[in-house]
Amino acid sequence: MAKPATIKIRLNSTADTGFFYVTKKNPRTMTEKMVQRKYDPVAKKHVEFKEGKIK
């Protein structure tokens, strides 16, 4: 069996609310850490989410 091309990552909120999203990325094409601006329902506004490892 071949190794999967995508890995699961965790996008942690920079608002320090503890909220996170789980998404996938291809580490061969996206070598840098992923940063996205998404909605944080705990903070009730859009904030940046930065990539972290799934424990």
Curated annotation (Swiss-Prot):
InterPro entries: Ribosomal_bL33, Ribosomal_bL33_CS, Ribosomal_bL33_sf, Ribosomal_zn-bd
Gene Ontology biological-process entries: translation
Pfam families from the UniProt entry: Ribosomal_L33
A GO term, aspect molecular function: structural constituent of ribosome
Keywords: Ribonucleoprotein, Ribosomal protein
Disulfide bonds: none
Keyword Ribonucleoprotein part of the UniProt annotation: yes
UniProt KW Cytoplasm keyword: no
PROSITE patterns registered for this protein in UniProt: RIBOSOMAL_L33 (PS00582)
A Gene Ontology cellular-component term: cytosolic large ribosomal subunit
Family in the record: Belongs to the bacterial ribosomal protein bL33 family.
Protein name: Large ribosomal subunit protein bL33
Organism per entry: Hyphomonas neptunium (strain ATCC 15444)
Gene name of this polypeptide: rpmG
